[in-house]
From Swiss-Prot:
Coiled-coil region list: none
UniProt similarity note: Belongs to the universal ribosomal protein uL10 family.
Any GO molecular function: large ribosomal subunit rRNA binding
InterPro entries: Ribosomal_uL10, Ribosomal_uL10-like_sf, Ribosomal_uL10_bac, Ribosomal_uL10_bac_type
GO cellular component terms listed in the entry, alphabetical order: ribonucleoprotein complex; ribosome
Description of how the protein assembles with itself and partners: Part of the ribosomal stalk of the 50S ribosomal subunit. The N-terminus interacts with L11 and the large rRNA to form the base of the stalk. The C-terminus forms an elongated spine to which L12 dimers bind in a sequential fashion forming a multimeric L10(L12)X complex.
A Gene Ontology BP annotation from the UniProt entry: translation
This protein's UniProt keywords: Ribonucleoprotein, Ribosomal protein, RNA-binding, rRNA-binding
SUPFAM superfamilies according to UniProt: Ribosomal protein L10-like
Protein name: Large ribosomal subunit protein uL10
Keyword set includes RNA-binding: yes
Origin species: Nitrosospira multiformis (strain ATCC 25196 / NCIMB 11849 / C 71)
Function per UniProt: Forms part of the ribosomal stalk, playing a central role in the interaction of the ribosome with GTP-bound translation factors.
Length: 174
């Protein structure tokens, strides 16, 4: 299905808006991937907050021109799907996990902040913990000293109460 000029401009504007908010873009070749598998991939991407779309490469080049992701233009060859996300790890995880289970999806390249990354670097990125997991670990690390301090403060009166209880028990038994 060919798009007229106004539709092409609308697609470029929509994708450009997503690219402006993005931290990472990952491109993958989907040659031979069935509709059912592509629908599953889209659903997983949507759940992870990833904008996932199949685009004409010429429109994608226009959308990323004059952005930190313009280096991806040289990799935009063949039937490609674009995963655009504000969390680089989430985008890498979704596409990498799906490509492990389906050999028809081949990750070609990606980009983060003026840096084009290879498919092996995307695999490494996918093995990192997600943003939420890192924030949870950070919060736990920050709360640990405070929690230990509170336990220490609570131990002083608790020890006093246990001492009084021991004295009471000793006097009652005597």
């Amino acid at each position: 299905m060919s798009l007229n000029l106004d539709e092409k401009k609308a697609v470029v504007a929509e994708v450009s808006a997503q690219v402006a908010k993005a931290q990472a873009i990952i491109i993958a070749e989907y040659r031979g991937l069935g509709v059912g598998h592509m629908t599953q991939l889209r659903a997983k991407a949507r759940q992870s907050g990833i904008y996932f779309r199949v685009l004409k490469n010429s429109l994608a080049r226009r959308a990323v021109s004059d952005t930190p992701f313009s280096g991806l233009s040289e990799h935009m060859v063949g039937p490609l799907a674009y995963g655009i996300g504000s969390d680089p790890v989430a985008a890498a995880k979704v596409l990498h996990e799906f490509s492990k289970g389906n050999d028809k999806l081949v990750i070609k390249a990606g980009a983060m902040a003026n840096h084009v990354i290879s498919s092996s670097e995307i695999a490494s990125l996918a093995s990192l913990p997600s943003r939420e997991e890192l924030l949870a670990k950070l919060l736990g690390t920050m709360q640990a000293p405070v929690a230990n301090f509170v336990r220490t403060l609570n131990e002083v009166p608790a020890r006093f109460v246990r001492g009084l209880a021991a004295v009471r028990d000793q006097k009652e038994s005597a």
